[in-house]
Amino acid sequence: MRLFKSKEKLSESESVYLADIEQKIKAYKAKGYRVPTRKMIKTAAQIKGIRRSAAINTAVLDLVAAHIHEGMTTEEIDTLVYNFTIAHGAIPAPLNYEGFPKSVCTSINEVVCHGIPTPDRVLQEGDIINVDVSTIYRGYFSDSSRMYCIGEVSEEKRKLVQVTRECVDLGLTMVKPWNFLGDMAQVINDHARENGYSIVVEIGGHGVGLEF
């Protein structure tokens, strides 16, 4: 059975291209690798929807960057995220997901992830905070987080934030056709360890695109 089908007649170059993909996928599968199903390969319309969702998601983080400050509560960050997301025709994905009560995760200092915004937690000078935003736009999911330094932070915290950003940038260089997720994970892990850090292995990522 062919992995790729089309109701439209393909050009010769398109046929050769798809045949090449089929052969590569079959070869990987024969070696025991997990390979993408046809469902995982997105259509042009789906990619457009995912990109729109991601654009809103990024705009939320930019908005937080413009407003976050010492004395702000994490509840105020949550309100900011919720209002902006709804105003742009989208939905905050975390809200009520498996009982999560808020629209965003706010993780401060030693909190690894999934911190819950509250009216009692006030940002203080020297804090570092990760704001993790997930957006649903017309059924398409996007997710990204960003670190923010509140005022002057210690050199220890500054270095952690900087190296983490470098890890992300290195990981992105591995996101290309026929690479493995493990290629991305490897360069991130290597750079973190070279700088005296380690990866949080107990917590993995989650889906974006058509699933959360």
Locate the predicted segments by residue:
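Active-site neighborhoods and metal-handling regions in enzymes and metal-associated proteins
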Residues: M1-F212
